[in-house]
UniProtKB/Swiss-Prot annotation:
It is an enzyme of class 1 (oxidoreductase). It catalyses: 17beta-estradiol + NAD(+) = estrone + NADH + H(+); testosterone + NAD(+) = androst-4-ene-3,17-dione + NADH + H(+); 17beta-hydroxy-5alpha-androstan-3-one + NAD(+) = 5alpha-androstan-3,17-dione + NADH + H(+); (20S)-hydroxypregn-4-en-3-one + NAD(+) = progesterone + NADH + H(+). Keywords: Endoplasmic reticulum, Lipid biosynthesis, Lipid metabolism, Membrane, NAD, Oxidoreductase, Signal-anchor, Steroid biosynthesis, Transmembrane, Transmembrane helix. GO terms for biological process: androgen metabolic process; estrogen biosynthetic process; in utero embryonic development; placenta development; response to retinoic acid; steroid metabolic process. It is found in: Endoplasmic reticulum membrane. Substrate binds at S219. It comes from Homo sapiens. The keyword Metal-binding does not apply. This is 17-beta-hydroxysteroid dehydrogenase type 2. Homodimer.
Amino acid sequence: MSTFFSDTAWICLAVPTVLCGTVFCKYKKSSGQLWSWMVCLAGLCAVCLLILSPFWGLILFSVSCFLMYTYLSGQELLPVDQKAVLVTGGDCGLGHALCKYLDELGFTVFAGVLNENGPGAEELRRTCSPRLSVLQMDITKPVQIKDAYSKVAAMLQDRGLWAVINNAGVLGFPTDGELLLMTDYKQCMAVNFFGTVEVTKTFLPLLRKSKGRLVNVSSMGGGAPMERLASYGSSKAAVTMFSSVMRLELSKWGIKVASIQPGGFLTNIAGTSDKWEKLEKDILDHLPAEVQEDYGQDYILAQRNFLLLINSLASKDFSPVLRDIQHAILAKSPFAYYTPGKGAYLWICLAHYLPIGIYDYFAKRHFGQDKPMPRALRMPNYKKKAT
């Protein structure tokens, strides 16, 4: 009996050790961001051996290790090997940081910028390696996109382009959807959605050569409805759906597609105070008199406080987004969706799985708690008139 117990004990000790060691070796070759999985695996080992019989405990644990090993195999990062990538919106913010980050990793970077003679483009030329090329690329102008394609194709020759990262975007003026001008809706769609589609369609022939990656930067606002973001959220929701459809269609070509849905990062997408003043003036100049009377000028002008709120709450550390984009570009089996940023994954899950009434309650409490009331709703006799 003691010999049997001793043999069983050694088996129960040796098998998990070997399996855990194998999985850990595979883990070290992966992206290095999966430590929580290792903790869960160790916990599973203890549960299996303590609750189940040694035989069934080892069987269940072995199956779990096999599944974990298979999963981690897909998370291994491919070598950079000066793979060529295109990044749009490289002038400032996330796109600017991404161009520098990928250049440091050893990629051949094509940085599409709105102004090739602007300070952002000049800084990229000054601080990055000779592998980085700056391209004039206003993604709302098909001529510039086609010209950029010709330059990239000529420089790559037969190499192919490994990844296209559609990052360029605009926020517009965050306020009630009724107050937004149609020009704001059209501008958000032109840059955030149609620009993404135009760049994708133009550069897909180069992606097919390499069987590479298409990475579209969407937003948490494209997956979870939030007040003040009618134009922006709608355009980003279109980007998310476009990415999902392209993921299905491009799989036959060996191209993998990922959608990045960040939340809460301090980029320059919100614009400057001068830009906001111009947008405020445009709204006040073009709103119908009845609408302006109901909302009140003070309500419209108070929306600029949202800019201060964004700047105070957003993170200046882009590293979670940069790591996720790196994973989407280099992982053998990238995820379809990435949600970097504080609360991004949570809010998207709440929007999809909570009853609508409950989600609306939490969204209004969180995103609209400091929002002023329109003028008409502040009138004491408004409800009496409504009834």
